[in-house]
């Protein structure tokens, strides 16, 4: 199990990213728009830099929903590989069977 402080930090990042998502997307689109003047694009980049660092969605980490493990997490299930294995063998994940050939 991951430390609670790390899980709380991740939740804080998610909330902050959700709060600034619209503004972040607008500024990002403006700074990447070739039709805009160089001055407008530079101003958009400056505004992006003024946003909180954790407002960037790239800083979020996918974690296992059960254990909080940051690595080896499958997006499809939101679980770490070890938990997928446990739950699959127990028959708790529908449609997953042990490979046999």
UniProtKB/Swiss-Prot annotation:
InterPro entries cross-referenced by the UniProt entry: Ribosomal_uS14 (IPR001209), Ribosomal_uS14_bac/plastid (IPR023036)
Alphabetic keyword roster: Ribonucleoprotein, Ribosomal protein, RNA-binding, rRNA-binding
Pfam family, one: Ribosomal_S14
A GO molecular-function descriptor: structural constituent of ribosome
One GO BP annotation of this record: translation
Function recorded in the entry: Binds 16S rRNA, required for the assembly of 30S particles and may also be responsible for determining the conformation of the 16S rRNA at the A site.
Annotated protein name in UniProt: Small ribosomal subunit protein uS14
Source organism: Polaromonas sp. (strain JS666 / ATCC BAA-500)
Gene expressing this chain: rpsN
